[in-house]
């Protein structure tokens, strides 16, 4: 599953299934990419999208580590492994490089 990623809406509770390896074939962890929903008609305040996604942690459907993979590490690997300079000059450059080197 190393090169298989899929995008997900921020508030979709089924995102948690990707990290529930006991229910996935071959005990695989699927690589989800946070889809922010910011462009949706029903998003009136962009600042609320990420906290809404974090409700999956608050409801014990995802661990904090799962959430970090969902919103940061998986997207970094998706874009950074195909273009190692993708994050150059951004606020997350240092953290992204650390993920790519791990």
What are these regions (language model features)?
Residues 5, 9-31, 40-102:
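Mid-to-C-terminal alpha-helical segments outside catalytic/metal-binding sites
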């Amino acid at each position: 599953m190393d090169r298989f990623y899929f995008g997900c809406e921020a508030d979709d509770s089924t995102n948690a299934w990707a990290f529930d390896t006991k229910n996935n074939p071959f005990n695989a962890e699927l690589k989800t990419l946070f889809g922010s929903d910011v462009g949706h008609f029903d998003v009136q305040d962009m600042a609320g999208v990420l906290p809404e996604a974090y409700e999956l942690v608050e409801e014990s459907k995802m661990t904090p580590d799962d959430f970090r993979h969902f919103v940061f590490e998986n997207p970094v690997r998706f874009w950074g492994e195909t273009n190692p300079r993708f994050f150059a000059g951004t606020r997350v450059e240092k953290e992204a490089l650390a993920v790519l080197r791990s």
